[in-house]
């Protein structure tokens, strides 16, 4: 669609292209109200025969054998009390809806399929068995990038910290690394009012993600302060498959043309009291010091 959109945001698809798009777009939702709203939205945008279905992907097998080239999803973050009672076709056994939804989408991509999925932080680092199994499956088969969003981007509806998982099954087979991107501001304040502000990282991060998907690792990415690239072996090292990018940042990475020097060679070190703590003796291992 982006390639067929003019400067004013109007879609310039031909009738045949629009018909092909309409025939290949599908949507599922468990809520009949959301299905009706989605159908009306499609009608208003000129799609006379939209394929939006009332369907529970977690407990029904009716459409299990349907696959997609591209999936975009913002699944529910919360599981109902008592958990989900899913069918037994999932590769990861869990009663947590956030685990099952991601599993479902990863399993229902075609061999060259791609997906963008918004997930709560539990998917990123929870240590439960199902979470680790899910992350292992994603790292080994489909995950190519993780975009960390600031807490509050969904205010006032939810203050949950979220990330976006980028899946690309074809690319995942060709590369042995995963890129992590950090968005600090999306152009709006993170309070309940979400007022527009000047700082907006999204255009830059979007460009970096595209470069990663098109070109792989290069100097600009490697040295960017909000990008971390980790090997799959590194992520799998302790069996946790943690998807927090900062965990893999090289603390010794030097983005400078100057040599490292010892602090004591260029400044007088004076151990002092700090934050109400007791006096720290200087033993060449002082972490917090004042310098002159």
Residues of each region from the PLM?
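Conserved Class I SAM-dependent methyltransferase catalytic core
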Residues: 30-37, 52, 95-167
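Low-complexity, Lys/Gly-biased intrinsically disordered segments
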Residues: 74, 259-292
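Short hydrophobic/aromatic beta-strand or adjacent loop that forms the aromatic wall/cage
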Residues: 160-164, 192, 248
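Conserved S-adenosyl-L-methionine
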Residues: 1-73, 78-80, 89, 95, ...
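Short, intrinsically disordered, charge-balanced linker/junction segments flanking boundaries
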Residues: 198-212, 247, 281, 285-292
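Conserved nucleotide-binding/hydrolysis micro-motifs of P-loop NTPases
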Residues: 76-79, 121-124, 153-154, 170-173, ...
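Non-catalytic DNA-recognition/assembly elements of restriction-modification systems
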Residues: 212-273
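Short, well-ordered beta-strand micro-motif
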Residues: 166-168, 182, 290
